[in-house]
UniProtKB/Swiss-Prot annotation:
Cofactor, free-text remark: Binds 3 Zn(2+) ions.
Function: Endonuclease IV plays a role in DNA repair. It cleaves phosphodiester bonds at apurinic or apyrimidinic (AP) sites, generating a 3'-hydroxyl group and a 5'-terminal sugar phosphate.
Swiss-Prot/TrEMBL GO biological process terms: base-excision repair
Family: Belongs to the AP endonuclease 2 family.
Residues that bind Zn(2+) 3: 181, 228, 230
Residues holding Zn(2+) 2: 144, 178, 215, 260
Protein name (database record): Probable endonuclease 4
Top-level division of the source organism's lineage: Bacteria
A Pfam short name: AP_endonuc_2
Length: 283
């Protein structure tokens, strides 16, 4: 099993994500557990949770990962956005506990002009609160590296390191490495030398064992553009080589890898992008 998959929709019920993943040829899937553009999500009923768990067990999928909603900003100053963010992430943890999902990917957030150190401190404080409030979620939060747009945090590995080391729960974190975001933020992963230097830096900052998931996305824009625009595999500025490097790197053989590339009218592009990625695997 290649541990390749996609972000899939939960339209019509969260259990439908399993069928969509299987239909697209996924080994693993990533989902939103609620509408990603609304603050308030619906609690998962025991019946819905059991249906999801049963379908997942029968599906052959090996990993399911959740992604938090885009509105959440745990780096925000005290106020309405911070309060809503804490509630929304707490509810995300509760839903994942009910569904049996053990990993939540999240964007660290934006300091909105208050400075990187201040934003990182706020994130650490938020997670110290959240892990204490939701003991039933026993999984990990995967911090996703970002493209570096605006005042967003997470575009350097040192940001992720500071969050993990600044938390009272350092063992509850991992990292999700997004290829588009890394390239956009200035990591030169498109050639062999840059790839090696990037992951050597990651290992020095965080330890390679902290890398627990990949988002495999090509980039519409060039190196260091600070713009987050995903493209089909091999059709953007990254090309095919960095994906070939990752898929054949023995360090990452057991790390689940998810595409978040454009879907097409009926999600047909997921199967095509996954087929292309599998063609890059050697041996």
């Amino acid at each position: 099993m290649d541990l390749l998959g996609a972000h899939v929709s939960i339209a019509g019920g969260i259990h439908n994500a399993v069928d969509r993943g299987v239909s697209s040829g996924c080994d693993v899937i990533q989902i939103f557990t609620q509408n990603s553009n609304q603050w308030k999500g619906k609690a998962v009923s025991p019946a819905d949770a059991q249906l999801f768990r049963d379908k997942l067990a029968a599906s052959g999928l090996s990993h399911v990962m959740s992604h938090d909603i885009y509105l959440i900003n745990l780096a925000a100053a005290p106020g309405e956005v911070k309060d809503k963010s804490l509630i929304a992430f707490k509810e995300e943890m509760q839903r994942c506990a009910a569904l049996g999902i053990g990993k939540i990917v999240m964007h660290p957030g934006s300091h909105t002009g208050d400075g990187e150190d201040t934003g990182i401190r706020r994130i650490c404080e938020a997670f110290d609160q959240l892990f204490g409030e939701v003991p039933q979620f026993t999984g990990k939060v995967l911090l996703e590296n970002t493209a570096g747009q605006g005042t967003n945090l997470g575009y350097r590995f040192d940001h992720l390191k500071a969050i993990i080391e600044g938390s009272s729960y350092p063992t509850r974190f991992g990292v999700c490495f997004d290829t588009c975001h890394a390239f956009a933020s200035g990591y030169p992963i498109a050639d062999r030398d840059g790839y090696r230097r990037t992951f050597d830096e990651f290992d020095r900052a965080l330890g390679i064992d902290k890398l627990m998931a990949f988002h495999l996305n090509d980039s519409k824009k060039g190196l260091g553009c600070k713009v987050d625009r995903h493209e089909h595999i091999g059709a953007g500025a990254l090309g095919l080589e960095p994906f070939r490097f990752i898929l054949n790197d023995p360090h990452f053989k057991l790390v689940p890898k998810f595409i978040e590339t454009p879907k097409g009218d009926a999600d047909e592009m997921d199967a095509l992008n996954l087929k292309l990625l599998r063609s890059l695997i050697e041996g």
